[in-house]
């Protein structure tokens, strides 16, 4: 097992549902974890599919919560958005954009292929300084509360297995293959360098 804990990042589009659910579970299990979004704005469901609530990444979860409470308490209570924001504000103050973070991670988990592509593109556009590898793995998770919870447990199990490998670089492909067979999901995986 590695002597130092894995530095993990979980990334979805708006740093609201999927990445925050995984952040919550991983931090409770003792992982060094941060979560991010890759979008240009934070989008939350609105009164209609074509009317999302759009916020800047600088907006706190508390401000979003109060804004939606004011707009339509019943709707946002019923669809679970207020509950989700309440959880989020207990984890960290506001959503963060992956592209603005210069921290180094051992493992970056993304929640959909488009986000995976954006993370890989961002990492590859940075100037390589240390040549330290970072494994980027995509676990497709539908953006709803139930799937976010199931996906978070899968991500957590995956991180625990990777944490317990003797040699992550040589064992990760085999480990991912086992996870694909067990979960019935396919994972994208690549290595980038810092």
Curated annotation (Swiss-Prot):
One of its GO terms (cellular component) is mRNA cleavage and polyadenylation specificity factor complex. GO terms for molecular function: RNA polymerase II CTD heptapeptide repeat phosphatase activity. Residues 160-186 form a coiled coil. The keyword Coiled coil applies. This is RNA polymerase II subunit A C-terminal domain phosphatase SSU72. Its EC number is 3.1.3.16. May be involved in the C-terminal domain of RNA polymerase II dephosphorylation, RNA processing and termination. It comes from Gallus gallus. InterPro entries: RNA_pol_II_suA (IPR006811). One of its GO terms (biological process) is termination of RNA polymerase II transcription. Its main location: nucleus. Belongs to the SSU72 phosphatase family. It is found in: Nucleus; Cytoplasm. Keywords: Coiled coil, Cytoplasm, Hydrolase, mRNA processing, Nucleus, Protein phosphatase. It catalyses: O-phospho-L-seryl-[protein] + H2O = L-seryl-[protein] + phosphate; O-phospho-L-threonyl-[protein] + H2O = L-threonyl-[protein] + phosphate. The gene is SSU72. The keyword Hydrolase applies.
């Amino acid at each position: 097992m590695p002597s130092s804990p894995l530095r993990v990042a979980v990334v979805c589009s708006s740093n609201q549902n999927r990445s925050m659910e995984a952040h919550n579970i991983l931090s409770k299990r003792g992982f060094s974890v941060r979560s991010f979004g890759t979008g240009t704005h934070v989008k939350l469901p609105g009164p209609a599919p074509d009317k999302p609530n759009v916020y800047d990444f600088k907006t706190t979860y508390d401000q979003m919560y109060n804004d939606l409470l004011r707009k339509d308490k019943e709707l946002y209570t019923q669809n679970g958005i207020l509950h989700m924001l309440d959880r989020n504000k207990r984890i960290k103050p506001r959503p963060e954009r992956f592209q603005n973070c210069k921290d180094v991670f051992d493992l970056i988990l993304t929640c959909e292929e488009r986000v995976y592509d954006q993370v890989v593109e961002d990492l590859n556009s940075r100037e390589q300084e240390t040549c330290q590898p970072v494994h980027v793995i995509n676990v497709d998770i539908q953006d709803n509360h139930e799937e976010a919870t199931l996906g978070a447990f899968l991500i957590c199990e995956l991180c625990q297995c990777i944490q317990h490998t003797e040699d992550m670089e040589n064992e990760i492909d085999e480990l991912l293959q086992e996870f694909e067979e067990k979960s019935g999901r396919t994972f994208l995986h690549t290595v980038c360098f810092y």
